[in-house]
Structures are given as C-alpha cells and as structure tokens.
From Swiss-Prot:
The gene is pdh. InterPro entries: Aminoacid_DH-like_N_sf, Glu/Leu/Phe/Val/Trp_DH, Glu/Leu/Phe/Val/Trp_DH_C, Glu/Leu/Phe/Val/Trp_DH_dimer, Glu/Leu/Phe/Val_DH_AS, Glu/Phe/Leu/Val/Trp_DH_bac/arc, NAD(P)-bd_dom_sf. The lineage of its organism: Bacteria, Bacillati, Bacillota, Bacilli, Bacillales. L-phenylalanine binds at residues 78, 276. One of its GO terms (molecular function) is phenylalanine dehydrogenase activity. This is Phenylalanine dehydrogenase. CDD domains: NAD_bind_Leu_Phe_Val_DH. The active site is at 90 (proton donor/acceptor).
Length: 380
C-alpha cells in the first residue's frame, strides 16, 4: 500500500470518527454554480431533521464540517426541549454571502435538500435570508421560516422574544418567589430583532434596563420607547454590560459571552437570553453554579422561533404557537428544580431531560424515513 493510499484511509477514518454521533452527512458540490455545502443530520429519533442554513467564508472544509456537526447536534436537543416532533440538522454553505450568492446557487442547494426525501428541513441562518430561499423553494418544499405571503408563519422573532420573556418570568419565580417582570433590573446585550422586542416587553412591565448595541439609532429608539412606559433605560458601553449591578443578564447578540473574562465581571443573580451557545464551554456552566448565578439554558429560552417554524410544516396556527411557547416557562422551572434536586448544573439538567425524551421515543422509532408534506409547493 502506497503512502498516498495510507494517508487517504487515515483521513477517511478521521472523518467517520468526527461524525460518529451523526446519522448522515451529505457533501454537496455543484461546479456549475460554485455551490459547496455540507448538510449534517444528527438524529431523527423524534422526526425529520430541522435546522437552518448558514453561509460563511470558512477557512477550510474541515472548519465547515465542524460547524455543521456541532450545530446539528445542538438542534437535536433544542427540538427535544421544545417538544416538537423533529430531530436535529444543519446546513452550511462555504462562501462569502456578500460576493458568492446567486439564484442558481440556491436552486442547486434546493435540489440537494430535495434529494433527501424529506429527512431534512431548512431555512435562514447567519449569512442567508428568505430571498435566497425563495429560489431554493423552486426546487424543494422542505423549506421553513416561509413568509406569510407564501403561507408561512412570518416573522419568527416575535415568538422567540415571547419565549425569552417567559424564560425570564420563570427565572424571576426561582429568584424572587414571584414571576413579575417589573421592578427588576436587567442588563440587555444586543437590541436586534429579538433583543429589541424583549426590551420593549420588559419596559412595558416597568423594568429597569441597562442596554448596549452597536446601532445608535436602535439605542435612541429604545430610550424613546422608555418614555412611554413606567420603565427606564440606561445606555452603557459594550464592554461595560457585563459588570452592571443588575438582577438578570440578558444576552441577545452572540455566543460565548459566558467565559473566563466575563465570569470575573458578573454581578447578576441570573442569566437568561436569546443568544445561542452562551456558555463558551460546558465548564462555564459549572462555574456559574459555583458562583450562585442561575443559568437558563439558551436552547430552551430561545426556542419560540423553532416552535413557529415547526408548526408551519402542518398548518400555521398562531394560537397553537402561542400556547406551546408559553410552555417555555414550565420547562425552565422544571430545569431549575431538577438541577437543584440532583445537584447538577442547569445545562446538565436540560440535556438529561432531552435525552430522556429521545430515549422514550427511540423505543418506538429510531430512524425517520418518510416525509412531512407542507402545504406550499412553488416548484416549477
């Protein structure tokens, strides 16, 4: 056996080691459009895989694969925690979203998604938007987060923000014995589509906010909003948000915000927000517990949007979405109580609850093969 052959076998073995927890990984290549993408299906015990598609100029295929594998596994737990009948998946497109997009590229991507026969449903994520997926929808009906004009649920930031507020209410219940949002001080990092709605909801209940955002107009808007409520807003610098004398830190921007540096600065009693992957490592969940800071697992708190897009695949029913989103309150309380009872971190408690649900379903159905059929189909 030649050195080249040995090297190839080692690389193949390493690849299978990396995806050992996953059911399926699809490498998509279309030279005509320049499409290079990876679709990772982690687990379909609960139903077809569901997860967004992001587009980034990854430095290597290996980096893109790592992202797809990590994010798809996270979606499995998020779906299980949200009590929706879907498993975890994720797609990544290798390319610069500012330069490399084209209608043809997303139609090619749609063809690859459709080839999976309903095992994977996807929609927008970092670097992609609904305009991109209107093109993909010409090749597949396995697209979620569809605009209302196409029969979808519309803006998913609304139920996402609502879920965050329910998560905060549950956190306040655990901290103070009552779930009122008003009369509590919050430090909100990020006033994007979700963060701004969360801030509005808290202000309307009479909360006191420290806020930071890179957009000056957004900061001015939330200060104007505060004038119409019994709440108040104080704008702080981005690097000062972690050290505010607040009750609850509400991260609504980016991940990894609970790390060695911020741990030294936190003066809050709890953390509950919409940002994904807030803990830089699992160890930081333990560090928070040791410091007496209550942590609301992000993938439960921010699951309102997922609940809506999962609901789309059957028939949009906003009342049903609202009712399911309200259960985030109960889920977070259950996590807190279980963590306290078992003397484990809240993240460990949340993961354990999800694994128990998957194990129970796995005794009846361990592999999803048939397709859910959404009502829209604009394929040519």
């Amino acid at each position: 056996m030649s050195l080249v052959e040995k090297t190839s076998i080692i690389k193949d073995f390493t690849l299978f080691e990396k995806m050992s927890e996953h059911e399926q990984v699809v490498f998509c290549n279309d030279p005509a459009t320049g499409l290079r993408a990876i679709i990772a299906i982690h687990d379909t015990t609960l139903g077809p895989a569901l997860g967004g598609c992001r587009m980034q100029p990854y430095n290597s295929v290996e980096e893109a694969l790592e992202d797809a594998l990590r994010l798809s596994k996270g979606m499995t737990y998020k779906c299980a925690a949200s009590d929706v009948d879907f498993g975890g998946g994720k797609a990544v497109i290798i390319g610069d979203p500012q330069k490399d997009k084209s209608p043809e590229l997303f139609r090619a991507f749609g063809q690859f998604v459709d080839s999976l026969g309903g095992r994977f449903y996807t929609g927008t994520d970092m670097g992609t938007n609904m305009e991109d997926f209107i093109h993909a929808m010409k090749e597949t009906n396995c697209i979620v987060g569809v605009p209302e004009a196409y029969g979808g649920g519309g803006d998913s930031s609304i139920p996402t923000a609502m879920g965050v507020l329910y998560g905060i209410k549950a956190t306040n219940k655990m901290l103070f014995g009552k779930d009122d949002l008003g009369g509590v001080t919050y430090a909100i990092q990020g006033l994007g589509k979700v963060g701004y709605k969360v801030a509005e909801g808290l202000l309307e209940e009479g909360a006191h906010l420290f806020v930071t955002d890179i957009n000056e107009q957004t900061l001015e808007a939330i200060q104007e909003k505060a004038k119409t409520t019994s709440g108040s807003v104080t704008v702080v610098a981005s690097d000062e948000i972690y050290s505010q004398e607040a009750d609850v830190f509400v991260p609504c921007a980016f991940g990894g915000v609970v790390n060695d540096e911020t741990m030294k600065q936190f003066k809050v009693k709890a953390i509950a927000g919409s940002a994904n992957n807030q803990l830089l490592t699992e160890d930081h969940g333990r560090h928070l517990a040791d410091k007496g800071i209550l942590y609301a697992p992000d993938y439960i708190v921010n699951s309102g949007g997922l609940i809506q897009v999962a609901d789309e695949l059957y028939e949009v029913n906003k009342e049903r979405v609202l009712a399911k989103t309200k259960h985030i309150y109960d889920a977070i309380l259950e996590v807190y109580q279980q963590a306290e009872l078992d003397q484990i971190t809240t993240m460990e408690a949340a993961n354990r609850m999800c694994e128990q649900r998957m194990a129970a379903r796995g005794r009846r159905n361990s592999f999803f093969t048939s397709s859910v059929k959404p009502k829209w189909d604009i394929r040519n």
